[in-house]
């Protein structure tokens, strides 16, 4: 198993999932571009887990994400549904019909200035109508992504970002994008707002068959499919789309891993009553149904709460972000996702999605929380033991699952990844004869330092840890959020304004936590307070009163799994 690619197929369902996915694929693409850099560690992460090789109509080799994404009409902006990599304008222009023609032209969206710069750096449109790509990596350590001939940085402005396709710099396969034409992305009418609407989409033969055809296309070319990762909006009707997609995957591909990342955008406000009630109902239905059909489910949000009461967004000591901008929030969540998914993307690891889920989800605990330190605060001259000791006994991670602060909660099992720390900093370089200031300073390898630290933090808890040299890529179009970091991602007291940060160290974790007991119970309590007669429109979308009663029972049963005291070490 360790020697093969162990392919993963990614499903992106929803518009905020598109934002997170765009940053995620940009980061994978940036990592591919560094594959031949002599400073980069080789062979830690296997890009073939996420990417597939192919050929254009003109025989040029391509390397594109193994991806199916679903979004609503009007969400693509200037991006073509079939992508641009395989398109042949000569074939588009070939018309066999000899009779009278009437031409209808749809007004094109203006292309984002950032994407215009990006495409000019990536290749040229030749006179014969064929797109000539300068260089596309093939996943085997071949040439990196082509850069522009001028040093002009390709940095989009926040004002220019309307939709996720405005900053996606990765070419997609024609089988990737699936648009739901019956609902609109913009405007107040025709929105995909409710869980029942989303379920109904994949009950329609048209969309179900389209999804199944795309699944078969990607799955049949895999040598060893380890499973599926679903990036799914929880706050709107895509929670229902995700639930039906997970159910389909469970039925069709039994035994494969299904890890679902339930995504929620930034803060919300009390004044938006209907939107908040719908968000609560969609989140609750989504969590319960996705848990039933997934190997593992993890909510991801920078918000402080899943419930009706607004809480301030989480704070990162070394980041300055705007929680109202999906472009910022999704970048941070994608960085965490790029780190916590490392275990099933390693070249040398036998860990699969199923193994990771089994370790974290014992005793029915299929919902986990995520946390991360972005960036990991290693200052110049510090060692890893020095930096870890600064955290003291507190849980170091910023919570990313809207479950409140983790202090005082119990962890039942955890998977931890620390990446981007130079090997020379892994251990303390003490002068011979100097007594080590802590047990961490006495460790002889970085892996030992990390394992010892986790044992001190959570004695007796089942922990899996990974230490990687490979950092997380945050080059443009990633937003400039790192005001306290130098170019290598090191934390500085006062970095020069505008310093270019292209990679950072990140400390990320997935945890089966007792905090979920309180979070899920609070979600159930908020639901019991609702007067459903006021929200008949949600019920009209295909949800019955009996479904609400069953939902409450399932939420409370799930919450009981996380009562403190129920763990492997008891």
Swiss-Prot record:
Claim: Cytoplasm is one of the keywords in the record: yes
Subcellular localization, as worded in the UniProt entry: Mitochondrion outer membrane; Cytoplasm
Primary subcellular site in the record, as a coarse category: mitochondrion
Domain of life the protein comes from: Eukaryota
Classification via SUPFAM superfamilies: Tubulin nucleotide-binding domain-like (SSF52490)
UniProt xrefs under InterPro entries: DML1/Misato, DML1/Misato_tubulin, Misato_II_tubulin-like, Tubulin/FtsZ_GTPase_sf
Annotated GO CC locations: mitochondrial outer membrane
Pfam families to which the protein is assigned, alphabetical: Misat_Tub_SegII (PF10644), Tubulin_3 (PF14881)
This protein's UniProt keywords: Cytoplasm, Membrane, Mitochondrion, Mitochondrion outer membrane, Phosphoprotein
Gene3D superfamilies: Tubulin/FtsZ, GTPase domain
Residues with Phosphoserine modification: 495
A Gene Ontology biological process term: mitochondrion organization
Role noted for this protein: Involved in the regulation of mitochondrial distribution and morphology. Required for mitochondrial fusion and mitochondrial network formation.
Family statement: Belongs to the misato family.
Protein name: Protein misato homolog 1
Organism: Pongo pygmaeus
């Amino acid at each position: 198993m360790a020697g093969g690619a162990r392919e993963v197929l990614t499903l992106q369902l929803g518009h905020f999932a598109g934002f997170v996915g765009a940053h995620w694929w940009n980061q994978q693409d940036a990592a591919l571009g560094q594959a031949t850099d002599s400073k980069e560690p080789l062979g830690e992460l296997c890009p073939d887990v996420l990417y597939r090789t192919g050929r254009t109509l003109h025989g040029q080799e391509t390397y594109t994400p193994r991806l199916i994404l679903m979004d609503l009409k009007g969400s693509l902006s200037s991006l073509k549904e079939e992508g641009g990599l395989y398109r042949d304008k000569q074939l588009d222009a070939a018309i066999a019909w000899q009779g009278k023609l009437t031409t209808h032209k749809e007004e094109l969206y203006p292309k984002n200035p950032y994407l215009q710069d990006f495409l000019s750096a990536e290749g040229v449109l030749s006179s014969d109508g064929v797109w000539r790509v300068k260089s596309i990596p093939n996943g085997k350590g071949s040439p990196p992504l082509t850069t522009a001939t001028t040093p002009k940085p390709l940095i989009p402005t926040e004002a220019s970002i309307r939709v996720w396709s405005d900053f996606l710099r990765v070419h997609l396969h024609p089988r990737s994008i699936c648009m739901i034409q019956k609902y609109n992305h913009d405007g107040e009418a025709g929105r995909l707002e409710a869980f029942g609407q989303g379920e109904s989409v994949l009950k329609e033969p048209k969309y179900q068959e389209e999804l199944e055809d795309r699944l078969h296309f990607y799955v049949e070319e895999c040598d060893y499919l380890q499973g599926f990762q679903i990036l799914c909006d929880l706050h709107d009707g895509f929670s229902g789309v995700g639930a039906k997609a997970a159910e389909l995957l469970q039925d069709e591909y039994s035994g494969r891993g299904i890890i679902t990342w339930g995504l929620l955008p930034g803060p919300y406000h009390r004044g938006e009553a209907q939107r908040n009630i719908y968000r609560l109902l969609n989140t609750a239905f989504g969590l319960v149904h996705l848990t039933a059909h997934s190997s593992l489910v993890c909510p991801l949000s920078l918000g402080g709460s899943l419930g009706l009461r607004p809480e301030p967004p989480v704070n990162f000591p070394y980041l300055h972000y705007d929680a109202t901008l999906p472009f910022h929030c999704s970048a941070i969540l994608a960085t965490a996702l790029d780190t916590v998914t490392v275990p099933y993307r390693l070249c040398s690891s036998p860990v699969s999605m199923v193994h990771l889920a089994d370790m974290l989800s014992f005793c029915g605990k299929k919902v986990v929380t995520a946390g991360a330190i972005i960036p990991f605060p290693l200052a110049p001259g510090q060692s890893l033991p020095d930096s870890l000791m600064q955290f003291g006994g507190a849980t170091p991670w910023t919570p990313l699952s809207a479950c409140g602060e983790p202090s005082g909660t119990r962890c039942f099992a955890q998977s931890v990844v620390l990446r981007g720390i130079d090997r020379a900093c892994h251990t303390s370089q003490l002068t011979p004869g100097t007594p080590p200031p802590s047990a961490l300073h006495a460790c002889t390898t970085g892996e030992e330092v990390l394992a010892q630290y986790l044992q001190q933090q959570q004695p007796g808890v089942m922990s899996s840890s990974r230490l990687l040299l490979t950092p997380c890529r945050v080059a443009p179009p990633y937003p400039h959020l790192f005001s306290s970091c130098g170019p290598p991602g090191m934390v500085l007291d006062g970095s020069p304004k505008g310093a270019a940060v292209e990679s950072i160290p990140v400390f990320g974790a997935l945890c089966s936590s007792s905090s979920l007991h309180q979070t899920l119970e609070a979600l159930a309590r908020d639901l019991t307070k609702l007067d459903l007669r006021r929200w008949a429109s949600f019920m009209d979308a295909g949800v019955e009163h009996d479904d609400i009663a069953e939902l409450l029972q399932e939420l409370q049963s799930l919450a009981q799994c996380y009562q403190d005291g129920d763990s492997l070490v008891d």
